[in-house]
Curated annotation (Swiss-Prot):
Organism: Hydrogenovibrio crunogenus (strain DSM 25203 / XCL-2) (Thiomicrospira crunogena)
Protein encoded by which gene: groEL
Family in the record: Belongs to the chaperonin (HSP60) family.
Keyword tags: ATP-binding, Chaperone, Cytoplasm, Isomerase, Nucleotide-binding
Compartments, record wording: Cytoplasm
GO BP terms in the entry: protein refolding
A single cellular component GO annotation: cytoplasm
GO MF term set: ATP binding; ATP-dependent protein folding chaperone; isomerase activity; unfolded protein binding
Protein name as it appears in the record: Chaperonin GroEL
Amino acid sequence: MAKDVRLGLDAREKMVEGINVLADAVKVTLGPKGRNVVLEKSFGAPTVTKDGVSVAREIELEDKFMNMGAQMVKEVSSQTNDVAGDGTTTATVLAQSIVREGMKSVAAGMNPMDLNRGIHKAVEAVVKEIQKMSVPCTTTESIAQVGTISANSDSAVGKMIAEAMEKVSTEGVITVEEGSSLHDELVVVEGMEFDRGYLSPYFVTNQEKMVAELDNPYILLHDKKISNIRDLLPTLEAVSKAGRPLLIIAEDVDGEALATLVINNMRGIVKATAIKAPGFGERRKAMLQDMAVLTGGTVISEEVGLTLENVTLDMLGETKSAVVGKDSTKLIDGAGAKADIEARCAQIRSQAENTTSEYDSEKLQERLAKLAGGVAVIKLGAATEVEMKEKKDRVDDALHATRAAVQEGIVAGGGVALVRARSKVKVKGDNDEQQLGIEIALRAMEEPMRQIAANCGLEGSVIVNKVMESKDNMGFDAASETYVDMIKAGIIDPAKVTRSALQNAASVAGLVLTTGAAIADLPSKDGASADAAAGGMGGMGGMM
């Protein structure tokens, strides 16, 4: 396919046009007085949002070179959202400012490579200052404040997230779901829950709820398929003598083995329930091992020389209770030793920190939460589907931001941290062009505060100058349009969010400034001729 090649300034100017289109649409959402953006949907009602990354993701431009620029800045907001969960609009505003000022210098004949080095030197120095300024976020009150800010000043959401973190610890899993009422509610699930249900409805003990409830059960953990009942007989006899129920968690249970378990259950000989082990492959083995640690049992695996015929009661795990539904199973209050559980948590935490795969990291965090704290579910209520979607976006953002705050601490919000950090930076470039790059980056750090003020209908320069004349955490509270101590007023940002926004913005802005050529596909001529043919057909139809 033929390509359209643009070189130098021609390529960069088109990309910058695209960047400005995307950034101008996103930045209207910044701050407590930011505006909503309405997104058209192919089906159903449009979505109304104040979430920067949701706006950015919707933007696709017709001009391919403009679209390249827009997609690069979209990457800034997506990357910031993935790493820190918030700060997407801030990152976009920073990237636009660095590109805009940098392009003026490149057009004036400056070396873009040196400008880029200067920008990165400034960002590195400011990031160090932000890390020095950060205050640990450990209290329920400060966690609630972070959640409130990230949920666009919705204090109820902030409080609910703080309460969820308090109940399941900062390690626990907190999920956000659409509820069925008009009110938000927090549901805390104790113990370990996973998405596997009973293999036969004949295992159900509570017909009303359609669940199998097992009190003080033994738990048999096996990493292979169980088809032959003879393999299970020694275990069933031992459990029957003990007079306790049995929960079998294996790769699968079918055929003769499943039929015998069902018959024994119906006749009341042994109260047993069988489920498939969660996960697949290596992850299944790891999750079975987690269950073994939690319940104080042993995974019966041929890899370690254990077979079903040799199982004794002390190899079985135990819990206070187990509830098995159609699609999920919950193990409550396992009999595993606390020291063993803590050691297993430390091992999983270490794996999560060292993995490069985002998917693996997410799954490891889930496993950690199930072992360490439990699961909290925030069920959202809203009057309409449009409101529900918008609220879910906000709560997801707030949840990510509070996690980021717990990890790296908090700094003054409202763009104050960037302005304070830039005033402390004394970095020098190796030459005039690097120095100019440093100045471009430092000037861009005022931009989020200017935009917050602009969204209030105020002059950004006046606000920035007034904040720079004051000290410490004094800043501009856009909600009340007053100057306050930002940390005391609870207007705070996670340090990780501010840091990620700045680093990602500088990274993409540097790429745009150092672009020497851009290549895109030319429009297909076949498409044009096909359109012409279609037009001709229509004309003929009119003649008949």
